[in-house]
């Protein structure tokens, strides 16, 4: 069964976890990249990203580095913006026919809570079985991330 971890990362939190998870389950890594990148100024990133997420906007993403049709199983990684998935991930889900391939999701937020985001995703992802909420590295809750990622990897391995 061919597996891939598909993720978007603005600050590097999601990217670091994606690499660890892909390594742990023996999956390829596919990073989502915007055609027009976000501004480098943090306040502008927050304003634009939050607005895009709140209004369900779908910014253009670059072509993927690998052919997504070749994969049987996908693990999705996203930061949480305005209580939902990051806009580039929204673009990915709408552009590619992969909803039935996604079995696991990992999310990042300041508070480490993803319940609202996962509730929305569960309605769109019929095979979603495993999820984990991780805290951004600046958060006090980030000390639990390593254990959570390890447990997430074990759960995903049991599925695939």
Annotate each language-model stretch with its function.
Residues 76-77, 105:
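Redox-cofactor binding/interface segments in oxidoreductases and associated redox assembly factors
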Residues 68, 94-101, 124-127:
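Short, conserved loop/helix-junction motifs that constitute active-site signature segments
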Residues 104-144:
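Short, glycine-/small-residue-rich phosphate/pyrophosphate-handling segment
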Residues 11, 36, 81-83, 110-113, ...:
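Solvent-exposed loop/turn segments at secondary-structure junctions
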Residues 1-76, 83-85, 90, 94, ...:
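N-terminal beta1-alpha1-beta2 submodule of the flavodoxin-like/Rossmannoid cofactor-binding fold
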Residues 40, 47, 55, 101, ...:
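Alpha-helix boundary/capping detector
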